[in-house]
Amino acid sequence: MKNKYDFKLVEEKRNEKWQKKGFFIAPKQTKKPFSIISPPPNVTGQLHLGHSWNAFIQDSLVRYHKLQGFDVLLLPSVDHAGIATQVKVEEDLAKKGIKKSDLKREEFIKKCYHWKEKQYLKIKEQWDKLGICYDFSKERFTLDQDAQIAVSDFFIKLWEKNLIYRGQKAINWDIKLQTAISNIEVINKPVEQKMYYLKYFLENSNEFLTVATTRIETISSDVALAINPKDKRYLHLVGKKVVHPLTKKLIKIIADSNVGSDFGSGIMKVSAHSILDFEIMEKHNLESKDCIDNYGNLNHEVPEFQGQNRFFARDLIAKKLEKEGFLAKIETVISNVGFSQRSDEIVEILKKPQWFVKMDELAKSLISHLNSKDKIKFYPKNFEKNLRKWFEKIHDWTISRQLWWGHRIPVWYKNDEFKVQIDSPGQGWIQDEDVLDTWFSSGISVFAFLGWPQNFDLIKSYFPTSLLVTGWDILFFWVARMYFSSLFIMKQKPFEKVLLHGLIRDEIGRKMSKSLGNGLDPMEIIEKYGSDTLRQALIFNSSPGKDIKFNIEKLNTAWNLNNKIWNIAKYIADLDTFFAKPDLIDLWMENKIYILKRQIVKNIKKYNFSVIGTEINNFIYGDFSSRYIELIKTRKNGFYARKLLRKVLIILHPFLPFLTDFLMEKIFKMEILEQKMPRIRQFKENQKVENILEIIDNLRTYREKFQISKKIILEYCIINDKFSNAEIDIINKLTFGKWLENKELVIKTKNFEIAIKVPEELKKEQKGRELKEIQFLKSEILRAEKILTNKGFLEKAPREKIDLERTKLEKLKEKLAFYEKK
């Protein structure tokens, strides 16, 4: 073995070997299963640090359970990522001078599949470098042929239960991507904008009502003013009419409990382009008319400003209203504005025909399950509460998207007829142009990837899956949808447990992003430090639900641990290996391994990886390296040390797969993934070794304190305690000491009194130091006496200062008397 840990030597082609030997091909279940469906990364680009973190956690858990004797399955997949991938492909085509509109739908989809294949190869290469134990014989793609059948079947089953409908409703519209998006794809951000206070004159009156709005551009779609029925200020006005400031038409004043009395003047204009406003219109049978088109421009409803961008038109409309006396004032405010998570453009609310999933019944089913004993266990627990709250206030889910790349909606039209089915009903039938929301297909992946609805072999063995590992940021996007979809289709929960981790941030707590320039490429880290080092740096800093503040120091710490393990293994491998029974030290070490294993088993159940990391670091640096290796240096035989090393490698394997596999192969000529988690004896007589270590530590501390050369034999004995000759021999060898009965200098430790015969060299040095101290004390006494006999000092100095000098003099004389007596 090389003198220094070389991760490139260790990790080269190791995952290739694991795959060739089929270590992670899930068998037909014969033992207890442990299964994870891996969150599918998007085929939009390469894996980032967050993907690596998630994959490492899953992989470590699967390896751990394999060593524990489980039948394991870690199923790999990638997501077609509808909107995101279509944008990437369009951008790629644009570089070649090709527009999406230049291609037929089928041609564009072929381009998307080509993109997917290219990106998937890159992702697989990255998985290989990470060392993830996927069963590639079962790999899936959210848009593969089986997935298309499953998604269409799911749609049809929801339709048959009257849980899917097509309706003209207010939806979130992405101006840039030209598609509908769901509510949870809208991110609210605080934005500085103008608040316009508009005058609405009462019919046939000079009195007016003041209405505050940030969306003056929607004024032409106003159909009413609304007040809260509990607001006594305006209750007498309900049923009356006001003059529309722009169109001069009369509109009604209505009462609705959704109006907030504390916002602005407490009067709300009811117009298109707000979900709340649309709900009020429906409740009061008011006609709605959009004044903004698909591209965010004002339409024919505002002839004077038709074609103007809605935000640019704000100032134009304000100037017109001010000129005509309908604008009271303008203020600058900070208020939340909805942005598309997909494009980062401001979302517009438009009323459009879309496909929706009715969520009431599905939400009730999920909440009911959360109230049962069979509910999914969330780590940390507080995310169960978050999920429950979200479902208690959930809206219907907009599932149609105006895209080409994705699952086509299985609905066919012919004249005024339509049919919901997978295949075309025949000639003249045209399929719906829209595709389904990406999360619609991802939401059934947990059972669809296992074969539903065509093959149930894997479902019988591995469903519900044991665990889902994912970031808390997609709890509502993905976890929630798999939950209710599984309850609806499979009539049971999708997984036993959900482990939610946080986000990876930089060392000052900022989210990593391209715009900030603080992102780190996991492949670049692996190229410099190795995969095991990156795994450690991420996993050993993981706690359920918590973010990681990542920095280079974490990588250095992880690399140092790998190097220490390498050095320990090399030392033991170089020892003689003739048969020998374990001695006291070996049994003590085995007990330390027993404690380590117990701590790992305890904490892995709670996914407390940071605690596991601390335990492993303390064990390697403390018990194994500083203690055991030091203790066995008193002998040349490493027979039992090798046995212990083998056990340690197996225990550490889930967290350091490459290094432990290499060392097992190199030293023991064995495959670590063919081993089982070792049984380890608990040793009750540890105190004897702890006593030896206590004596060694104190003798070493004494030697270091007085800088006594190792060439000088340290003579000592332990007062009123018996140590065997073998134990004394160990102490002597590791402290360069010699047992000698004496009572010259007694050191009290936690459990013992150690008598040390002070070396002559030290005595001489000590005597010289004491003579110098005596001379110093005498000179200080003379100085103090001179001051205290000075009349000027005694007359002018404050009483406190005189007393302080007298106290100093007394202490100096006491100290001098001590040294002279000595």
UniProtKB/Swiss-Prot annotation:
Enzyme class (EC, first level): ligase
Keywords associated with the record: Aminoacyl-tRNA synthetase, ATP-binding, Coiled coil, Cytoplasm, Ligase, Nucleotide-binding, Protein biosynthesis
Main localization of the protein described in the UniProt heading: cytoplasm
GO CC term (a single one): cytosol
EC numbers: 6.1.1.9
InterPro entries documented for this protein: aa-tRNA-synth_I_CS (IPR001412), aa-tRNA-synth_Ia (IPR002300), Anticodon_Ia_Val (IPR033705), M/V/L/I-tRNA-synth_anticd-bd (IPR013155), Rossmann-like_a/b/a_fold (IPR014729), tRNA-bd_arm (IPR010978), tRNAsynth_Ia_anticodon-bd (IPR009080), Val-tRNA_synth_C_sf (IPR037118)
Motif ('KMSKS' region): 511-515
GO MF annotations, alphabetized: aminoacyl-tRNA deacylase activity; ATP binding; valine-tRNA ligase activity
Reaction(s) this enzyme catalyzes, per UniProt: tRNA(Val) + L-valine + ATP = L-valyl-tRNA(Val) + AMP + diphosphate
GO annotation terms (biological process): valyl-tRNA aminoacylation
Record's subcellular location: Cytoplasm
Binding-site residues for ATP, renumbered to this chain: K514
Entry coiled-coil feature ranges: 765-822
Position of sequence motif 'HIGH' region: 41-51
HAMAP family: Val_tRNA_synth_type1 (MF_02004)
Written domain comment of the UniProt record: ValRS has two distinct active sites: one for aminoacylation and one for editing. The misactivated threonine is translocated from the active site to the editing site.
UniProt-listed PANTHER family: VALINE--TRNA LIGASE, CHLOROPLASTIC_MITOCHONDRIAL 2 (PTHR11946:SF93), VALYL-TRNA SYNTHETASES (PTHR11946)
Function: Catalyzes the attachment of valine to tRNA(Val). As ValRS can inadvertently accommodate and process structurally similar amino acids such as threonine, to avoid such errors, it has a 'posttransfer' editing activity that hydrolyzes mischarged Thr-tRNA(Val) in a tRNA-dependent manner.
UniProt xrefs under NCBIfam families: PRK05729.1, valS
Stated family: Belongs to the class-I aminoacyl-tRNA synthetase family. ValS type 1 subfamily.
Oligomer and partners: Monomer.
Protein's recorded name: Valine--tRNA ligase
Species annotation: Mesomycoplasma hyopneumoniae (strain 232) (Mycoplasma hyopneumoniae)
Upper lineage: Bacteria, Bacillati, Mycoplasmatota, Mycoplasmoidales, Metamycoplasmataceae
